[in-house]
Amino acid sequence: MPRKGPAPKRPVVADPVYGAPIVSQLVNKILLDGKKGLAERIVYDALAGVAAKNGQDAVVTLKKALDNVRPALEVRSRRVGGSTYQVPIEVKPHRANTLALRWLTTYAKSRREKTMTERLTNEILDASNGLGAAVKRREDTHKMAESNKAFAHYRW
């Protein structure tokens, strides 16, 4: 383990086109094999598609989609005695944002549309309307936390 302490958190640089840090985080989540230009093209085309289909600002729609996907609770495994309990805990804002972006991109990749741009466009639109696999994942996570509420006193 390093002796200097934890690495400092670096501020997220806003992306050059929309001027929103959340867009650059989405680009970094889409990024594969260091091909940032390709990732930027996918995200920008997807956001242009969102604006065209929705008729609203793409960044506003993306933020609404992330609000619908962002979890408030999750479960963590905690070993007490000989048994392991799923303990519900509140999710910190930074982790909630990261999970929302991760789920959005993961479920966009698993969609059936032909191009990644179309998949991401439709997943963002579905999530902003409260539909889609990413929103379902959040609901499942909340349901799991709700059903394990009895073990909340094991929180640490």
From Swiss-Prot:
CDD domains: uS7_Bacteria (cd14869)
Pfam families (alphabetical): Ribosomal_S7
Listed InterPro entries: Ribosomal_uS7, Ribosomal_uS7_bac/org-type, Ribosomal_uS7_dom, Ribosomal_uS7_dom_sf
Gene Ontology biological-process entries: translation
GO MF annotation, one: tRNA binding
Annotated Gene Ontology cellular component terms: small ribosomal subunit
Cross-referenced Gene3D superfamilies: Ribosomal protein S7 domain
Superkingdom classification of source: Bacteria
Sorted UniProt keywords: Ribonucleoprotein, Ribosomal protein, RNA-binding, rRNA-binding, tRNA-binding
Alphabetized PANTHER family for the sequence: RIBOSOMAL PROTEIN S7
Record-stated family: Belongs to the universal ribosomal protein uS7 family.
Task performed by this protein: One of the primary rRNA binding proteins, it binds directly to 16S rRNA where it nucleates assembly of the head domain of the 30S subunit. Is located at the subunit interface close to the decoding center, probably blocks exit of the E-site tRNA.
Assembly, per entry: Part of the 30S ribosomal subunit. Contacts proteins S9 and S11.
Protein's name according to its UniProt entry: Small ribosomal subunit protein uS7
UniProt organism field: Clavibacter sepedonicus
